[in-house]
Design a protein with these regions (language model features):
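Short functional hotspots at interaction and active-site rims
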Residues: 1-157
Length: 157
């Protein structure tokens, strides 16, 4: 990822190396709690049903507690009966956002911050990208995460 805009002194051109061509897709998936980002996973390639189910069973479910609520958007990979069953077996409740409502998804705000961080670090190799993602996840404070939920109009009641 690279920044699309930059600054330079008046009269000088802003120059920075930017990769060209279409690179590989890297997908990040994670969960957001009031305390911070949790259950992160990076996947080479696009998200699909089998990959999301593996994420839920192997990464997300071990972090869930009875009574937790798992909010997901309407990606087809999220709607698998096996995903629902795995979440419910952990004592958590799966819920889906209304269609076309990213403003009600607090993790979208966190993803925006993470993407800005990744553009700033300008990682050019897969290993550097994975390291940058790990460093970016650690920048989320509990107060900031609580504010994401407040901005998405969630409350603790």
């Amino acid at each position: 990822m690279a920044r699309r805009y930059g600054r330079a002194p008046r009269g000088e051109r802003c120059q920075a190396p930017v990769p060209y061509g279409h690179g590989k897709t890297t997908t990040f998936v994670g969960a957001l709690r009031l305390e911070g980002m949790t259950a992160p996973m990076v996947l080479d390639g696009a998200m699909h049903g089998a990959a999301f189910l593996a994420y839920v069973e192997q990464v997300l479910v071990p972090t869930l507690s009875p009574g937790d609520i798992v909010i997901m958007d309407n990606l087809s990979a999220h709607k698998s009966p096996a995903v629902r069953h795995a979440i419910e077996a952990a004592g958590a409740e799966p819920r889906f956002l209304p269609p076309y409502s990213p403003d009600f998804n607090p993790i979208e705000m966190a993803f925006s911050k993470l993407k800005a961080f990744l553009k700033k670090t300008a990682a050019r190799t897969v290993d550097d990208l994975w390291d940058a993602i790990a460093n970016g996840i650690n920048t989320f404070t509990p107060t900031e995460c609580q504010n994401y939920f407040t901005a998405a109009e969630y409350n603790r009641e």
